[in-house]
Amino acid sequence: MKSSVEQLNPTRVRINVEVPFTELEPDFQRAYKELARHVQLPGFRPGKVPARLLEARFGRETLLDQVVNEAMPSRYGQALAESEVQPIGQPEIEVIRKEYGQDLAFTVEVEVRPKIALPDFSTLKVVVDPVEVSTDDVEAELRSLRARFGTLIGVDRPVALGDFVSIDLSATINGEKVPNADAEGLSHEVGYGRLIAGLDDALVGLSAGESRVFTTQLATSKHAGQDAEVIVTVKSVKERELPEPDDEFAQLVSEFDTMAELRANLGDQVRKAKYAQQAEKIRDAAVDALLERVDVPLPEGIVQAQFNNALHDALSGLGHDEAKFAEVLAERGSSREEFEAEARSAAERDVTRQLLLDVVADDQKIQVGQDDLNERLLATSQQYGVDAQQLFGFLRENNRLSSLVTDARRRLAVAAVVEAATFTDSDGNTIDTSEFFGKHAQSDKADQKTEEADPNSDAIDEEVDEAAE
């Protein structure tokens, strides 16, 4: 077999392949044997029908098509291996010559990972915001802790923000009741508009036994996107009484004896959380700084596929109703043109970062280990609020374990850039990134999290190893 590669543009190649007919003869023999096993002709035992009779009955062209269609994928794979081309899209195959007794010729056009010239990461200088813990930050954390131990007491006054209410709800559209929209005795914390848009505004000022009608746009069911008249009735009003922030409270909720010790500990927790937030900003800033120094050609097919996915996801929640989609966009003060422009821009940004990090991972010869995958599995499960084993099962059943490997590899690529670059805050202080991005920090955190959550059995470890390979 002979193959050659033409570079059509920085992200697309054409592979020309020629396969001598003699190389296809074993494929023909297998095709004849397989066909003969399923054909019954008078005078011949199963599997013993001569090739010439099979050709006469089914046509040589039919057999040729079958052999060629089965042969091209493996020959394409062989051509990729020989040329070291790294495809990132679906191949487009065109048969140039296909005649019995003659060499097979076909071409494959496919999008490939572009070549990117990387700078010396140690020359990157990045500035981010400093970590600052204020008294207000600590007080907010303390209020949250006090709220967890608060007591709900009934009050005889109108509803205010922060109250807990028991309510009844019903909805109508054009005077007709919306099926399955009624609710009785529903508990709701006013000011945390998680139920229905406009509900909190309607509740404030009502007393127990009073009702109010307001208009809102339904977000689910077959009526999604339609305006509905909602009636809310307040059944009861309660407020949360917070415990006093004294030494007794500190002893109740922690291992500390005094409020001063508890406040100091809360300050440490806030500081750690802010350092973690700063680490994410450092991660993004490192990639942005690198992007300013490199040129990343974009494969249009990959960008288009990501754009199509975004559009599909937006429409699927509305039953692919274009009119409803237009209404929802109009309510947000947007339009289809603006949505598509933003979606394409996001797709281009995501693909650019993905391609860059893949090249960095190759350049740094990054290998993904089991601990890295365990960490990503646990972090992703926490992000979506699901059990790690359930997430693993979902990824395995949907053949998406490789996406976990890719994600882990790209994060390690960012860590390599961060470790080499210099980071300072806007006050001029050098930032030590080793806690979150050092070589040992990655595996140490993975070991710790794995021990805490234990999401992996031996069977899971084996499959994770296979995915990494």
From Swiss-Prot:
**Domain PPIase FKBP-type stretches:** 162-243
Note down the stretches annotated as region Disordered: 429-469
The taxonomic lineage of its organism, from the top, reads: Bacteria, Bacillati, Actinomycetota, Actinomycetes, Mycobacteriales
This molecule's function is given as: Involved in protein export. Acts as a chaperone by maintaining the newly synthesized protein in an open conformation. Functions as a peptidyl-prolyl cis-trans isomerase.
Q: Which reaction does it catalyse?
A: [protein]-peptidylproline (omega=180) = [protein]-peptidylproline (omega=0)
List, as start-end ranges, the regions of compositional bias called Basic and acidic residues.
437-452
Domain statement: Consists of 3 domains; the N-terminus binds the ribosome, the middle domain has PPIase activity, while the C-terminus has intrinsic chaperone activity on its own.
**Which Gene3D superfamilies does the annotation name?**
3.10.50.40, Trigger factor ribosome-binding domain, Trigger factor, C-terminal domain
Question: Where exactly are the transmembrane stretches of this chain?
Answer: none
Provide the protein name: Trigger factor
**What Pfam families does the entry give?**
FKBP_C, Trigger_C, Trigger_N
Top EC class, one word = isomerase
What are the BP-aspect GO terms?
A: 'de novo' cotranslational protein folding; cell division; chaperone-mediated protein folding; protein transport; protein unfolding
Name the UniProt key words of this record, in alphabetical order: Cell cycle, Cell division, Chaperone, Cytoplasm, Isomerase, Rotamase
A GO CC term assigned to this protein in UniProt: cytoplasm
Q: What EC number is given for this enzyme?
A: 5.2.1.8
Q: Which InterPro entries match?
A: PPIase_dom_sf (IPR046357), PPIase_FKBP_dom (IPR001179), Trig_fac (IPR005215), Trigger_fac_C (IPR008880), Trigger_fac_C_sf (IPR037041), Trigger_fac_ribosome-bd_bac (IPR008881), Trigger_fac_ribosome-bd_sf (IPR036611), Trigger_fact/SurA_dom_sf (IPR027304)
Task: List compositional bias (Acidic residues) regions by residue number.
Answer: 453-469
Coarse class of the protein's main subcellular location: cytoplasm
A GO molecular function assigned to this protein is: protein folding chaperone
Of which family is this protein a member?
Belongs to the FKBP-type PPIase family. Tig subfamily.
Cellular compartments annotated: Cytoplasm
